[in-house]
Amino acid sequence: MSSDNMIDLEGYDCMAWYDEAVFYHIYPLGLTGAPKTNDYGEPVHRLNTLLPWVKHIKETGFNALYIGPLFESVGHGYETTDYKKLDSRLGTNEDLKAFVKECHEQGIRVIFDGVFNHTGRDFFAFKDLQKNREQSPYKDWYCNVNFGGNNEYNDGFSYENWGGYNLLVKLNQHNPAVRDYICDVIRFWVSEFDVDGIRLDAADVLDFEYMKALRRTANEVKPEFWLMGEVIHGDYSRWVNEGTLYSVTNYQLHKALYSGHNDHNYFEIAHTVKRLYEMGGNRPEGLKLYNFVDNHDVERIYTKLQNKAHFTPVHVLLYTLPGVPSVYYGSEFGIEGKKERYSDDSIRPALNLADYANAAEENPCTKLIAALGRIRQHTKELSYGDYKELMLQNRQYAFSRSLDGKSVIVMVNND
């Protein structure tokens, strides 16, 4: 990579923090080694064990953190019991406030996981529905409640769920009371925890008018409050626009980055980038997608790569292609994690930071990630620059990121 002299940033004062964000991603129930099932007992202050990670996050070149799910649930975190209470396996609301405060003091923005498509069965509205049935004031809070049906829990009624799992009860997003409640949750998270944004879980099945209501609330609660959505397939511009979300997860590039290296096929990567760039109107500010090579739902990149040396070009591309880069906790150390059929434990492990005390000096993966983070944060072309493909072959790929007449040239190979 090469760059001309530093550019004049006078014209970029209006840019938001997320335009230059480099994200670190934590799944806290996994990283802290929390029990798989919540007994709703006394809080255990596991979140406090993540405070030393804040310094590590900063020193490894990150200036933003996506952490979640965080709030009270019975199991993996996505079956919410209470949106306004930190999961008791992680601690108390005071612990979460202190954690966000420490991140902010280190110059790290924080976004939470917002699980607003569905609730768990222990959520107050569903408990009332179980108790009062047709007389419940919350009977219209959920989709397709049928009091003539039943389910494996023998509720005496059936309902729409997410993903075929009745543990995850789909909210009726057309109901104004539901919208008002969730918007109030967003306001609470800002006033209580000073959060900087939200990643919307299952955004690809959220109602668009519902998301627009969330966006209006986001615009009101805090300057530069960022809404990013989990979307797998489709035309991302349906979600990323002025009235809906600021960004979505870039699963299309995620797939191309690892398979393009395993198959020695940079055409797959370059054509994916071109297609995504065109979705945004051929301008970098059009779609600033949330780029990643692994996360809490997919296999670790170091496991997916057939040639482990490709860890380097994969991450060079992650940090230099249009979009917002993100690294999943532990992957900066090059750890492995295979996706298993009935368990995500191997991709959501507990880690002890002390075991990686010398990684910054001795671990080549960590050194690479830290160097790329520094480059990204000090090279504005990578955040704001136009993209232009310069050379493309099966095993070689070059492109430029240009801004105000100055360019960064990126060249990678997969030999």
Predicted segments, located by residue:
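Core domains of carbohydrate- and sulfate-ester-processing enzymes
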Residues: E102, Q106, F124-L168, K255-M279
